[in-house]
A protein has these predicted regions:
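A glycine- and small-residue-enriched flexible loop/hinge signal that marks low-structured segments
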Residues: 2-64, 68-392, 403, 418-419, ...
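C-terminal edge-of-domain segments
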Residues: 430-465
């Protein structure tokens, strides 16, 4: 994968490298959208590793709906098409239950630690006298069911029935064999949820790093964890990975303190939702849940569109509405805020990130989510194309022309997609191609949305047209 190079730096490892600069002005790899990385807590599912979940598959069958899995739910409400899911934590204890058999027992153990509240029922299958069924419940809901042969060595048959289970392990104990009597919702011995520390978030971020994503959100309003996410995004940027973090703190935090938190990031790859307390149709949402929905929206929105004044149909009411001066202050300090449109629908006031100050390599465009998404997409697509040609063409006039042509093709595609005004690829004139190294300039003008519309009204006293 492409990596970052500083001006004047030459690399040891073969590969393609990129550098970002401010464009000098006067004064057939496509986009991958809708991918959200989510760090959360649960009581079931694989712990400390990533599970990639497609939207149509749902997360409930893997992680249930407990803990802070609602972060995934909100990301999907926001439009996420794919989740890079990681249950954070370490330690804990697995729930288990031992069922009596003719002799000995059959022990059923949850594969993962957590306090899920499982119970088990064993009964004759109503439609087949030769079969029994074992049903695992989580709370009052059926979670998993297996069938096994009735009569004979039912204990072994039950163990065999769980052989392909993704959630439970079954084993004989105390020489278990023979019939397994009926039981009704016999409770599992309680487990313990894994403990969660900042170290567990750091581990989860390392796991997530192995996968492509557009945005990332976490299940906490803790500022220390938000800083971990920010540092993580900076680190993977230097390895050619482009992600945007979306966070929110508790609305009980003073307005000025929240402004300071947002301004403290001052970067294009962090989005801070300042008035996160909202009412959905059936529940109150705030903090990480709101940030997760915005993460889904940012990831899913094509880079030729802006989220400014995009209505959020899930939200019915804003619980913390600002004055005009507060909205202006929020935007100036790098906050994303919710407001109402003229139809009293909740929408995003201004789709900006936390960047406040520009520098020698970042212009004003880096303050906007749309333009950051466009630029990240361009760099990703060009980097992948360049990486695909490493070692495949000669470093001569023809080979470099091939590289430039392939890169130009992607630029042209993004122009046609309405994402760029123009983009031109040419060999860099400041560095001379030699041995195995060559350099290219990508001169880009990216598009923006009309977000400030000024109207001049000119009235006259005369009533004659």
């Amino acid at each position: 994968m492409a990596g970052y190079f500083q001006i004047g730096e030459t690399k040891i490892r073969p590969g393609s490298y990129f550098n970002v600069q401010k464009r000098e002005e006067n004064n057939e790899f496509g986009a991958v959208d809708g991918v959200v990385a989510v760090l959360f807590r649960s009581s079931i599912g694989p712990l400390g590793t990533v599970k990639v979940i497609e939207r149509e598959d749902g997360y409930e069958g893997v992680y249930g709906t407990g803990g802070t899995t609602d972060a995934m739910r909100e990301a999907l409400y926001g439009g996420a098409q794919k989740l890079v899911a990681c249950w954070i934590g370490s330690g804990g204890a697995n729930e288990s239950v031992s069922l009596e058999a003719g002799t000995g027992k059959v022990k059923i153990t949850a594969q993962y630690p957590g306090r899920a509240g499982f119970s088990v029922t064993v009964r004759q299958k109503l439609t087949d006298a030769g079969r029994k069924e074992c049903i695992i419940y989580m709370g009052a809901e059926e979670f998993e069911k297996v069938n096994f042969t009735a009569g004979g060595n039912e204990a072994q048959a039950l163990v065999d029935a769980f052989a392909d289970s993704k959630h439970f392990l079954a084993a004989l104990e105390e020489g278990g064999e023979g019939a397994v009597p009926a039981v009704s919702q016999s409770a599992f011995a309680s487990g313990e949820d894994p403990a969660v520390t900042n170290g567990d978030y750091s581990h989860a971020l390392e796991e997530v790093e192995k996968y492509y994503f557009n945005t990332i959100c976490v299940d906490t309003e803790d500022k220390g964890v938000h800083e971990l996410v920010s540092t993580f995004l900076d680190r993977i940027y230097n390895a050619g990975r482009f992600g945007i973090g979306v966070v929110a703190e508790k609305p009980t935090l003073d307005f000025e303190e929240r402004l300071q938190s947002a301004a403290g990031f001052d970067k294009e790859n962090m989005v801070y939702v300042i008035n996160s307390h909202v009412a959905a149709k059936l529940e109150e949402l705030e903090g990480y849940r709101t940030a997760a929905l915005v993460a889904g929206m940012v990831a899913a929105c094509p880079s030729n569109q802006s989220l400014t004044h995009t209505v959020i149909h899930r939200y019915a009411e804003i619980r913390e509405l600002f004055t005009n001066s507060q909205y202006e202050k929020a935007i100036k300090n790098g906050c994303l805020a919710f407001s109402y449109n003229t139809d009293d629908k909740v929408w995003i006031e201004s789709a900006n990130n936390t960047m406040i100050h520009t520098d020698e390599t970042h212009d004003e465009g880096w303050k906007k989510i749309r333009r950051v998404r466009t630029r990240y997409e361009l760099m990703y697509r060009l980097n992948v194309q360049a990486d695909a040609m490493v070692g495949k063409v000669d470093n001569d006039i023809n080979g470099r022309a091939t590289i430039a042509g392939k890169l130009q093709g992607i630029c042209n595609a993004m122009v046609n997609e309405g994402k760029l005004v123009s983009a031109t690829v040419a060999e860099n004139t400041g560095y001379v191609a030699d041995t195995d190294s060559c350099w290219f300039d990508i001169d880009v003008i990216d598009k923006d949305s009309a977000e400030h519309i000024y109207l001049f009204y000119k009235f006259g006293f005369s009533t004659i047209g």
